[in-house]
Structures are given as C-alpha cells and as structure tokens.
Amino acid sequence: MSAPVITNIEDLRELAKHKVPRMFYDYADSGSWTESTYRANEADFQKIKLRQRVAVDIEKRSLKTKMIGIDVAMPVAIAPVGSVGMHSADGEIKVARAAERFGIPFTLSTMSICSIEDIAAHTKAPFWFQLYVMRDRAFIERLIDRAKAARCGALVLTLDLQIFGQRHKDVRNGLSALPKPTLANLINLATKPR
C-alpha cells in the first residue's frame, strides 16, 4: 500500500485521525471549554491571504531573519505542545530535529514527555523552553537551571495555568492527569498503535 499524498494540513489531520488513538487525536485537535477560541483561531487563519507578486525579480528571495538575536530560516517557531510523546515515541525529539533541519526554533513544553536533557542530547541547535509560572518557586528555579544547562536560548513564559481548562473531549476519552484505562480506550490503543 502506497503512502498517502499529503498536500495540506487537512490531509495531515485526516491521516492522524486514522493512525492515532482517538484520545490522543482529540487531545491535539481540540480546545478547552466550548472550544470557541480554537474555532476563532482557525477562522482567523482562514482570513490570511498570500499575495502573489508578478513581474518582480525573485532570484534572491529569502525568508531568513533573526529572532531574539538568532539566525532563522524563516520567522516561525514550533510552539510548545504538551505530551507530543503520546502521538509518537520520542515525539518531542523528532519535532526538535525537524525544526533543526528546517532552521527554525523548537519550543519544548513544560508538559512534554521527553525531558529538557533528552532534547539537548539529541539536537545541536539551541531550543526554547516554555515555562509555566507556578506557585512552587523552587521547582521553577530548578526548571530554569536545567534549561540553562541544556543550552535553551529562550524561556517562553506561560501565565494561563491558574486553573486547568476543562477539555470536554479529554473528559469523554478518560484522558486526564491520571488517565482512565476504559475498555474503549484500550481497544482504540490496540488498533492504532502509533
């Protein structure tokens, strides 16, 4: 069987829907509460139009720039996504390596499965670390020290962890801080082992 032809994000979404266990797919492809922000973000992206330029010299075009003093291939970065390792073994390492190959920053989530040290051991380029600001200051300081030691080039502060947003699909799927192994989840995991 040949690999599917991927031409856009929707193709990737459909591929993931069939290859990834439902609870993990829903985690990545949903938001909290009513998902109104998630839907608004998608709608805002649909409003962005690329403008074609004609009759101009494109011989020396380049997206290269600097972000916080670091040379990058284009002005984008991989945003922090918690628990990427749920979707693929060593998921964060794979994403960090891909970002490195493309010359863009990778941001490791505080909620990642791979550690800060794992990413540093498997990449050469500096990466960014997303830091949730929490009450336990000693824990925060230890995370910052680990990020420095792992050559993180930036801390991306996240301030919205005052309370966890209720993610309705995660609740339905039994995916929580302590996942509930329901029969439906176990069957889904067994049939989609990626």
Write out the residue ranges for each language-model feature.
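An N-cap/entry alpha-helix motif that binds or orients negatively charged groups
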Residues: M1-G69, G174-R194
